[in-house]
């Protein structure tokens, strides 16, 4: 699709510091999965544990249904979950959900992938080379507090209404936390480890690869998790404003058309995808960092 007009549609349906021992990096933001501890507790599983873990979500869904059914709020403002589910099925059967979902996932994956690759390299280079740090660090610190959604008009002005503006926006927004986490992780490597490697004949490149990067990995993975959340936020925000496809476009168009049950269906789809991506990432990280336990 082209991005010429934000109010046309082809839809079939109308009407989100714990110090690890022996290192200077932080893994607090990744939660307890990053830390060692009681191995028996870490391995506990089963239905009771799952119910306890996700009970707040079940209670939220129950409260939603009760409030909607009792008429405490307008059904248009908060449709019953069965109507939301029916609208989701209609969107899925028509193919609109999958087509727009693929467009969103492609943009998000492209921007996040570039951010991880380039941000990691820049962060480690800042920690490893003082001249690079002197040049790059002020730029990163200056732009980090800026709300990245404020860059949407700038990206449209520079890159137009196509996918490029959205991908670059996600790239910029996600690269900053990745860069800072890679920098902090690499800079926190104990100097005695680097000196020991060098005294044993390791070159600077080998010391970087075999000492600094493994030491920086937990902090870097923490930053990537933050970037993953940023990617969802920036993706939907940009598609709400300047897109003719994607989840954000669907939410905006369905909301403007008063199809609130379908709008909530798309919102919940994005929420579930974000939650699943975060849980899947934590499982991957737990495997990657198994050597630390």
Question: How should each PLM-predicted stretch be described?
Answer:
Residues 110-140:
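Transmembrane-helix boundary motif in ABC transporter permease subunits
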Residues 1-47:
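Intrinsic disorder/low-complexity segments
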Residues 156-157, 186, 233-270, 289-293:
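Glycine-rich helix-loop "coupling/hinge" segments at transmembrane-helix boundaries
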Residues 130, 187, 218, 222, ...:
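C-terminal transmembrane helix and the adjacent membrane-cytosol boundary/short C-terminal tail
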Residues 141-177, 184-185:
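Generic hydrophobic transmembrane alpha-helix motif, especially the helices
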Residues 168, 172, 204-237, 270, ...:
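Transmembrane alpha-helices
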Residues 45-46, 70-116:
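Periplasmic/extracellular loop-to-transmembrane helix junction in inner-membrane transport proteins
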Residues 181, 185-226, 247, 251:
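Short cytoplasmic-facing helical segments at TM-TM junctions of multi-pass membrane proteins
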């Amino acid at each position: 699709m082209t991005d010429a007009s934000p109010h046309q549609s082809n839809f079939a349906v109308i009407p989100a510091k714990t110090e690890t021992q022996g290192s200077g990096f932080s893994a607090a933001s990744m939660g307890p999965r990053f830390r060692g501890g009681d191995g028996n507790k870490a391995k506990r599983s089963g239905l009771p544990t799952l119910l306890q873990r996700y009970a707040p979500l079940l209670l939220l869904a129950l409260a939603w249904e009760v409030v909607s059914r009792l008429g405490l709020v307008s059904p248009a403002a908060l449709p019953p979950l069965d109507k939301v589910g029916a609208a989701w099925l209609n969107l899925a059967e028509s193919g609109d959900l999958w087509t727009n979902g693929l467009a969103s996932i492609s943009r998000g994956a492209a921007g996040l992938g570039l951010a991880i690759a380039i941000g990691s390299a820049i962060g480690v280079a800042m920690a490893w080379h003082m001249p690079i740090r002197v040049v790059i660090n002020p730029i990163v610190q200056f732009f980090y507090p800026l709300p990245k959604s404020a860059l949407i008009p700038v990206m449209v002005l520079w890159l137009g209404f196509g996918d490029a503006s959205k991908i670059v926006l996600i790239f910029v927004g996600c690269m900053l936390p990745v860069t800072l986490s890679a920098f902090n992780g690499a800079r926190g490597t104990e100097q005695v480890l680097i000196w020991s490697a060098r005294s044993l004949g390791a070159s600077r490149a080998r010391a970087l690869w075999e000492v600094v990067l493994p030491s920086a990995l937990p902090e870097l993975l923490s930053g990537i998790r933050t970037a993953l959340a940023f990617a969802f936020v920036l993706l939907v925000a940009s598609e709400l404003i300047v897109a003719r496809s994607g989840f954000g476009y669907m939410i905006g168009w369905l909301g403007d058309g008063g199809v609130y049950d379908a709008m909530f269906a798309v919102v919940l789809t994005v929420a579930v995808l974000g939650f699943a991506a975060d849980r899947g990432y934590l499982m991957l990280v737990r495997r990657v960092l198994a050597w630390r336990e």
